[in-house]
Amino acid sequence: MDNSRILHTELCDMLGIEYPVLLAGMGGLAGEGHAAQPKLVAAVSNAGGMGVLGATGLPLDELRAEIREIKSLTDKPFGVDVLLPEDLSVSPPPNMSLVKLKRNFIPKQHIDFVEKLAADYGVPLTEIRQELVFSVEHSKKQIQVLLEEGVPLYCAGLGIPDWLVPMAHEGGMKVLGLAGNVRGALRHKKARDDFIVAQGYEAGGHTGRIGTFALVPQVVDAVAPTPVLAAGGIGDGRGLVAALVLGAVGIWVGTAFLFAEEANITDIHRKMITEANEEDTRISRVWTGKTLRQIKNPIQEAFDSSGLRPLPMLVQLLLMMDLINSLAKAERHDLLCAPTGQIVGMLKETKPAKQILDDMVNGAIKLLGETLPTKVKIES
């Protein structure tokens, strides 16, 4: 990065970072690692952006260990993303075994479907009997770890963290919430979040139904003066400039950083995204019960054509958990969820995270300082 050319917004001052680029807190499903792990988080922070750890579902000891690993790799600010599935219509008790949870909450036809899938692919289906670590109760315990470890930024990928904002602010931790529509953004504003990410339909992972270009300016207007970041379909300097023009103070970037050397994804996932184009993603509720964009695969296609109704969040994940872990154990990563945004078609090369960030920021600087002034003339 040319240190004489700095791209700076109010977000940089509020978070103590050089460039208005945040790594999306990309997590993983049971049996798969989280893409935004400590090495990637630290690399983005060290490059001048802000890395965010994807921590949903991590056991408390692993969460604490990963936060401390990040601290050992960088002295720059970073964040942690934990989903808060507070909007469940069915919330399994935290101390109930997974086997009993299934018996109590999951319809037989759904279980039969998963068992048939496992048989069709020749994967032994092993029941998991560990503690359910993706729950409301567990999320609250994770937040306590963040406060104890002095994490600068908490990110709510799902859910409205109204109950924790006062506690976070008292502990010196800022709060960021993601929204896929204006209604959700207003709920985050009411909860007094410090920042709101307006995430468009194009994004990978859990996403909504409104496109980024339509969503961002509406959220900016609705929640002013709360700072807004843009997400969804942003992968280079052009996307960064567009976000700023729409009124955002920065960007929340996931898919572009899947191409980082430090990203914790399997070789098969990396091959899939490298070969994919903009038409190769699908939105499905098969994995978690929430709409989630991923590279299309046979498991997703089978569920979406089965006629089965997706179950509420957590319950759907509980349904799929044994299959996910069994597929991972059998190294059938080609059948597992690969969250990816529509921007994937323009990203082909694996690079260090620093180069990805540098290219993005330098591209934006060139557009703002050189390209646009020669292409756009304002005459009186």
Give names to the regions the model predicted.
Residues 1-223:
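Active-site entrance/lid segments in N-terminal catalytic domains of soluble metabolic enzymes
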Residues 40, 96, 100-111, 214-229, ...:
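Conserved active-site-proximal phosphate/metal-binding subdomains
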Residues 182, 201-202, 233-234, 256-257:
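Acidic, glycine-rich active-site loops and adjacent beta-strand->loop/helix elements
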